[in-house]
């Protein structure tokens, strides 16, 4: 029974054996892995305490049974500094009591004050979590935007290089007037008995092919 209670209030969950037994690469690849559980409705337990899905993510201090030490509207940064200072002062007072009068009833009061100060500090820090989440999302989206802009710029640079290569290729082509002049100087080759066949082959040759042959002959 004691072991069962210890497991229920354990600060850390049990090792997730179901993950490495059921969610193997082969099971995931063959679609044999179990489906995720449905969202919890109603109440649930975590770290030995019961919570409700209808509760706010950050519950007010009064709802948790603690006395509020600061007003409803305040500067969180200023209040955190004040709480940190009060925490240090109460801790020094507790040390002084333990040294001079260990059996004083004020010792329990100081410990309770320290506990209340820690609760308030953690509550204020938790109230910053939504702002932290929004800031983290903003930074992540800015990073994705910058990466996409860099990728777009690389594509644009490659496009400019391709255009430059195409323009250079067009510029290196010979002038059409020069091509016509070279075509006009090409004379049919005397092939003897096969003259008619050679003539027929020459008539079917593309002018650019004849121009290329002429250029190769001059090299």
UniProtKB/Swiss-Prot annotation:
Belongs to the Mediator complex subunit 7 family. Keywords: Activator, Nucleus, Transcription, Transcription regulation. One of its GO terms (biological process) is regulation of transcription by RNA polymerase II. It is found in: Nucleus. Component of the Mediator complex. The keyword Translocase does not apply. Its main location: nucleus. Component of the Mediator complex, a coactivator involved in the regulated transcription of nearly all RNA polymerase II-dependent genes. Mediator functions as a bridge to convey information from gene-specific regulatory proteins to the basal RNA polymerase II transcription machinery. Mediator is recruited to promoters by direct interactions with regulatory proteins and serves as a scaffold for the assembly of a functional preinitiation complex with RNA polymerase II and the general transcription factors. Pfam families: Med7. It comes from Aedes aegypti (Yellowfever mosquito). One of its GO terms (cellular component) is mediator complex. One of its GO terms (molecular function) is transcription coregulator activity. The lineage of its organism: Eukaryota, Metazoa, Ecdysozoa, Arthropoda, Hexapoda. This is Mediator of RNA polymerase II transcription subunit 7. Residues 173-203 are annotated as: Disordered.
């Amino acid at each position: 029974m004691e072991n069962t209670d210890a497991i229920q209030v354990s600060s850390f969950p049990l090792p997730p054996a179901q993950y490495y037994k059921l969610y193997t690469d082969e099971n995931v690849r063959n679609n044999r892995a179990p489906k995720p559980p449905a969202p919890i409705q109603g109440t649930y337990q975590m770290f030995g305490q019961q919570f409700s899905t209808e509760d706010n993510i950050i519950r007010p201090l009064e709802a948790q049974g603690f006395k509020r030490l600061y007003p409803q509207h305040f500067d969180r940064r200023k209040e955190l500094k004040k709480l940190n200072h009060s925490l240090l002062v109460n801790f020094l007072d507790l040390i002084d009591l333990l040294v001079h009068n260990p059996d004083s009833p004020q010792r329990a009061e100081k410990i309770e004050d320290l506990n209340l100060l820690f609760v308030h500090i953690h509550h204020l820090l938790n109230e910053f979590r939504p702002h932290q989440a929004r800031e983290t999302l903003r930074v992540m989206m800015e990073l994705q935007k910058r990466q996409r802009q860099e990728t777009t710029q690389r594509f644009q640079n490659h496009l400019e290089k391709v255009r430059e290569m195409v323009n250079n290729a067009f510029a290196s082509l010979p002038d059409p007037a020069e091509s016509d002049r070279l075509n006009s100087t090409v004379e049919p080759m005397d092939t003897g008995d096969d003259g008619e066949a050679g003539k027929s082959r020459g008539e079917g040759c593309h002018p650019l092919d004849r121009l290329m042959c002429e250029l190769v002959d001059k090299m």
